[in-house]
A protein has these predicted regions:
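Sec/Tat signal peptide C-region and signal peptidase I cleavage site
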Residues: 19-23
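N-terminal pre-domain segments of enzymes
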Residues: 25-38
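Solvent-exposed, charged/polar functional surfaces in cytosolic regulatory/catalytic domains
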Residues: 50, 54-57, 61, 139-146, ...
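Acidic/histidine-rich alpha-helical segments that form the ligand environment
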Residues: 121-154, 164-176
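Short, contiguous alpha-helical
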Residues: 25, 41, 45, 49, ...
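Bacterial N-terminal signal peptides
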Residues: 8-17
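Short, flexible helix-adjacent loops and helix caps
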Residues: 63-67, 109, 145, 149-152
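Bacterial N-terminal signal peptides that target proteins for export
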Residues: 1-9
């Protein structure tokens, strides 16, 4: 019996060593077995990272001189009733995503945003909007780290919980990511996520 325990310990330690080497070499980390309980913040943070990478790829792919690009009013049919003045430029959309990130993830509690969210909405240059967006993602990651099994479903506004607000924030990004992709393609740019 002692010998069996030693064998199990040696095999377990060897497996840990292999996992560590794979992690250091950039290999795919081991999959989490089905049924494993994962903290809500960690789970949502992984999803946020996926969309952050896609969005940051898109905003970095658009040249600075195209940040004022918006689709031409000519592409809209009169019967659609589109109010063209409400169509955002690429840069305005990037600033809007940053503002929304600060709003949605501030509802999780923890640190309040240390930026003027209204001022973020007025940014126009690529450099400024990308910097604001990068900051908003860093803030979102910090806020998600405060989400635990104990507080994940605490209400924050009416019937909205911390988790539903975080999920809404991520869903909001997905919506605008689709628009960013269309704007890139209208300018002959293949989105980085589509190049993989």
């Amino acid at each position: 019996m002692k010998m069996m325990k030693r064998i199990v310990v040696v095999v377990a330690l060897a497996a840990c060593g292999v996992s560590g080497v794979k992690a250091q070499t950039g290999a795919t980390p081991p999959k989490v077995p089905a049924g494993t309980i994962i903290e809500p913040g960690k789970s949502l943070d992984g999803l946020l990272k996926i969309y952050e990478d896609e969005i940051m790829g898109a905003v970095n792919a658009m040249p600075a001189d195209k940040y004022d690009f918006a689709p031409s009013p000519a592409i809209f049919k009169a019967e659609q009733g589109v109010k063209y003045e409400t169509v955002r430029t690429f840069g305005a959309m990037v600033a809007h995503i940053a503002q929304a990130n600060y709003y949605f993830f501030s509802t999780l509690g923890g640190a309040k945003p240390d930026v003027d969210m209204k001022a973020v909405g007025n940014l126009t240059s690529k450099e400024d909007t990308v910097k604001a967006l990068t900051g908003s993602f860093a803030y979102a990651h910090k806020q998600l780290a405060t989400l635990t099994a104990a507080n994940a479903f605490a209400s924050v506004k009416d019937d909205q919980t911390k988790t539903s607000m975080a999920a809404f924030g991520i869903a909001h990004m997905c919506d605008h990511y689709g628009q960013l992709v269309e704007y890139l393609r209208m300018n002959g740019i293949v989105p980085p996520a589509s190049q993989k």
